[in-house]
């Protein structure tokens, strides 16, 4: 079992990967990738039942993960690489022409770990609900995990999927929201506020867990609660996070939602993060 210290070390390296990938590509979304790093690190290295050696897009016999907030591709690519889905060295190809690591997850080049393309915000939760229903019909007891953004939650399709999943009683569906309070145009509360988000999901018939998205003990406890749920309801984990977490000048501002750092800024950011697993 991966220890809390090991999770912290993996997360530090993932954050370094994110910064180096986006800087080289001169394009990408570092802010939300940094805020969701701890969540995906815990999920892939402690929670999910998955095996890169036998993984297929059908995910038969193992848990499934979808990234609904597809612009957070850098964090997913790094986590997948360190989990053994493809060589870590391939991270250097983010957004290159012909690369398997497109700016948003794509199935065009058959990158292991990617079930469906994503990036058109709001669609991933619907897809995850469909996969959860399919697993139930197939007699597969495994779970489906999906990560959404809080800005993404302004999309109407999120709430259509919420109704569908609750109506179908999909208690093997675990959704997560990276609740960092920022989106491309500013603070979420200023753009289209998500007041009473916990109450909204409860009203839609979901189990709701609120957790600190940067504390591994809190994250793991939230997943434990979600995975133990067997009451005929899907579960939403609202992870309270900070945009750009881990880098002081990126933290807590929407300015780094979709902006690549310069070489100098990247160096300053990397100086704040331990190289724990070795840079690619």
Predicted regions mapped to residue ranges:
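N-terminal capping segment at the start of a domain
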Residues: 10-27, 178-180
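Histidine-centered active-site/metal-ligand motif
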Residues: 29, 71, 104-107, 123, ...
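Thiamine diphosphate
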Residues: 111-113, 117-120, 125-229
